[in-house]
Amino acid sequence: MKSTSDLFNEIIPLGRLIHMVNQKKDRLLNEYLSPLDITAAQFKVLCSIRCAACITPVELKKVLSVDLGALTRMLDRLVCKGWVERLPNPNDKRGVLVKLTTGGAAICEQCHQLVGQDLHQELTKNLTADEVATLEYLLKKVLP
């Protein structure tokens, strides 16, 4: 009897490949970022907050496609590290906004400098420039 994941991989092989590439990207990102004591998941949250400047946890959850409980725990860790702060939401007395601190903006910039083009080059090292362009074009075509 086949496992559920085997059946899923047979039905949606492209999904499995995309998932594997994403996992490889996250592993590489974790390796690159480890000297700064930040994980790929934390970096993604910081980048998303940076792009929005100030965002509600619910909006951030949608951007990242993660569980709100997991995001809340992640935000708690980022607050403890001094990279994120929670502020009262002037439009919702019960809600909060999350914003990067000066330290959060600095670590975000350090991460960008550390990773730079190296991650992209490592991920695409077995592809020609034309293949990279084609892959990018096709993946964008799959997205809405």
UniProtKB/Swiss-Prot annotation:
Protein source organism: Escherichia coli (strain K12)
Record gene name: marR
Keyword Cell membrane attached: no
Stretches assigned to the HTH marR-type domain: 11-144
Function: Repressor of the marRAB operon which is involved in the activation of both antibiotic resistance and oxidative stress genes. Binds to the marO operator/promoter site.
Gene3D superfamilies on file: Winged helix-like DNA-binding domain superfamily/Winged helix DNA-binding domain
Gene Ontology MF terms in the entry: DNA binding; DNA-binding transcription factor activity
KW Cell membrane (keyword) present: no
SMART domains: HTH_MARR
Alphabetical GO biological process terms: cellular response to antibiotic; negative regulation of DNA-templated transcription; regulation of DNA-templated transcription; response to heat; response to stress
PANTHER family, A to Z: MULTIPLE ANTIBIOTIC RESISTANCE PROTEIN MARR (PTHR33164:SF87), TRANSCRIPTIONAL REGULATOR, MARR FAMILY (PTHR33164)
Pfam families: MarR (PF01047)
Keywords annotated in UniProt: Antibiotic resistance, DNA-binding, Repressor, Transcription, Transcription regulation
Protein name per Swiss-Prot or TrEMBL: Multiple antibiotic resistance protein MarR
Outcome of swapping R77L: Increased transcription of the region II transcript
